[in-house]
C-alpha cells in the first residue's frame, strides 16, 4: 500500500486483513421521481442508503469470526481474489477496510463523519497512488512471515477446474509528489517522502521442499 504521510518525520501504517462479508442488496430506483427537487431528494436518499449499507457491513464484520469447523474462513484476504478472469473492480473487503480505517482515524461516529468525508469536501490525498490487479505470473516469488522465499502459485485447484490468484497491489505514483515530497507538508520545516510499504496477505504458495499450503506473504 502507499504510505499516507503526515507532518512528522516517520509514519508507519500496517493494514489488517478482513475475513468475510455478508451479501449486499439495495432496492429502489429513480424512475418514479418527478421534477428536479424530487430527483435531488431521491439521489440523497440513495446515497444515504448506500452509506447505511456500508455501516451494516462494517457492523457485521465486527461480529463475524472464523469458527474451528470452518477452516477456510481465514483464507480470505482483502487484497487477494480467486477468479477465472481479471477482476473489474477493487475488492469490496478492501474498500470496506479503507473506509473503516478512515473512520477509526477520525475517532468519531460514522454518522457524524459521514458529512465530513474528504470526498465531499474536495480534499486531496497526501500521496498519490495507483492500484492494479496482478497475478502470480508477474510475482513469481514472495517472502513469507518467517523470512523464507516461497513460490506463489498462479492457479488454485477447485472442484470444477482451476482459478487464478489475483493480488490487488497499491503503489505510490511515480509521478507528482512521490519524489518532490508529500502534498500539504511545509518543506521549510519538514522533509517528507511518499513511499510504498508492504503488507501481509494469505496466498497459496509452495516452499523449497515442494510443500504447498496457504501462507502469509508480503506484497
Curated annotation (Swiss-Prot):
GO BP: cell surface receptor protein tyrosine kinase signaling pathway; modulation of chemical synaptic transmission; negative regulation of neuron apoptotic process; nerve development; nerve growth factor signaling pathway; neuron projection morphogenesis
Compartments, record wording: Secreted
SUPFAM superfamilies: Cystine-knot cytokines (SSF57501)
Glycosylation sites: 107
Pfam families hit by this protein: NGF
Signal peptide: 1-5
PROSITE patterns for this protein: NGF_1, NGF_2
Main location, first listed in the record: secreted
Disulfide-bond pairs as recorded: 127-194
Key word Transit peptide present: no
Gene Ontology cellular-component terms listed: axon; dendrite; extracellular space; synaptic vesicle
Propeptide: 6-114
MF terms (GO), sorted A to Z: growth factor activity; nerve growth factor receptor binding
Keywords: Cleavage on pair of basic residues, Disulfide bond, Glycoprotein, Growth factor, Secreted, Signal
Protein family (similarity comment): Belongs to the NGF-beta family.
Function (record text): Promotes the survival of neuronal populations that are all located either in the central nervous system or directly connected to it.
Protein name in the entry: Neurotrophic factor BDNF precursor form
Organism: Loxocemus bicolor
Lineage: Eukaryota, Metazoa, Chordata, Craniata, Vertebrata
Gene: BDNF
